[in-house]
């Protein structure tokens, strides 16, 4: 697979070499307008998470539209450095950074732009304070609260209060608030998503209230992600929603958020049609990243992408679909999970 594939501007989509990740700008811009429009007239604002698309030009389009707080969120230090070099002035690294080398890089970055960082334990807070003090910079800190994700975050209770008090008193750190992420829908079952999400969001808000009762201000309550925006708008105390998937969208969330449409799709070529009931595409595991779910074949009724090896994608065909995909034809695949699929491409 050739990555990146360079084609002159104006090349018809059908003439692109494959596999290729293709972005429909009209659909993407419409997704941005629809999603961020929900925040335009509210005190709660969106903070775009750029980890899914990793593209400064797309992030600019997001910040140029209504409804954001003017900042972005990233998941890795490398992402933060790329977007800082692209001129972004408010970056939240919504993850923990613990190694000495990365803390040095983080502090160097804070000398260039305003950087926020997640913390969920006092030892890490002390590390960050020492690094920031040595570098002569200030790091914005958000205490990460565990709210159902089962990964990073300190549980609601005395530990969270003590951590906030510690951060609030450490040199080189500015306690900006708290953050948390809540789980998305369970597969295709959305029946309990509303209640579960509201409960999980309330855990984060209760952490804010508990910390404030101890005498420490919590001006920012940042929650994530795209799937929880409508519930977050109902919860007093939330100040921002970190959301990443909405500009490009994927099949995983499409049924749950029908107001948004997939803007990024994979163009593949049929390289073989060895038997009536099967066609073979040149988009395999390396092009589609089907780890969390198989991409969906678009526009071919009776056809479905069923299995993938490194460089081959197998499409099962039934009925009239057996006549539709012959060697040399093109096919469209909608990624099931956006971030992993986009990560396969250089652009």
Task: Report each predicted region and the residues it spans.
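Generic N-terminal amphipathic, Lys/Arg-enriched alpha-helix
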Residues: 4-23
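N-terminal glycine-rich anion-binding loops that anchor highly charged ligand groups
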Residues: 4-8, 27-58, 75
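C-terminal accessory subdomain/extension
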Residues: 274-347
């Amino acid at each position: 697979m050739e990555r990146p594939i360079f084609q002159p501007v104006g090349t018809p989509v059908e003439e692109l070499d494959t596999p290729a990740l293709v972005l429909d700008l009209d659909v993407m811009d419409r997704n941005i307008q629809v999603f961020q429009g929900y925040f335009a007239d509210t005190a709660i604002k969106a903070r775009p998470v750029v980890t899914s698309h990793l593209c400064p030009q797309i992030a600019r389009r997001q910040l140029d539209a209504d409804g954001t707080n003017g900042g972005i969120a990233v998941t890795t230090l490398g992402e933060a450095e790329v977007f800082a070099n692209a001129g972004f002035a408010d970056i939240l690294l919504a993850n923990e950074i613990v190694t000495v080398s990365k803390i040095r890089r983080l502090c160097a970055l804070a000398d260039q732009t305003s950087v926020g960082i997640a913390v969920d334990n006092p030892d890490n807070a002390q590390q960050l304070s020492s690094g920031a003090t040595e570098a002569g910079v200030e790091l914005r800190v958000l205490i990460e609260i565990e709210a159902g994700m089962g990964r990073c975050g300190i549980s609601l209770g005395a530990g969270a209060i003590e951590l906030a008090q510690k951060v609030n008193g450490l040199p080189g750190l500015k306690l900006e608030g708290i953050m948390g992420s809540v789980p998305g829908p369970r597969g295709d079952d959305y029946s309990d998503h509303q209640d579960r999400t509201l409960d999980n969001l309330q855990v984060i808000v209760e952490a804010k209230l508990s910390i404030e009762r101890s005498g420490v201000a919590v001006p920012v309550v940042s929650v994530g992600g795209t799937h929880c925006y409508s519930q977050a708008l109902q919860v007093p105390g939330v100040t921002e929603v970190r959301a990443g998937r909405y500009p490009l969208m994927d099949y995983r969330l499409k049924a749950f958020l029908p107001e948004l449409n997939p803007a990024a799709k994979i163009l593949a070529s049929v390289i073989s049609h060895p038997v009536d009931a099967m066609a073979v595409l040149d988009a395999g595991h390396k092009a589609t990243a089907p780890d969390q779910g198989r991409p969906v074949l678009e526009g071919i009724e009776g056809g479905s992408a069923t299995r993938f090896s490194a460089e081959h994608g197998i499409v099962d065909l039934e009925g009239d679909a057996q006549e539709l995909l012959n060697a040399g034809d093109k096919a469209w695949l909608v990624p099931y999970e956006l971030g992993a699929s986009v990560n396969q491409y250089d652009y």
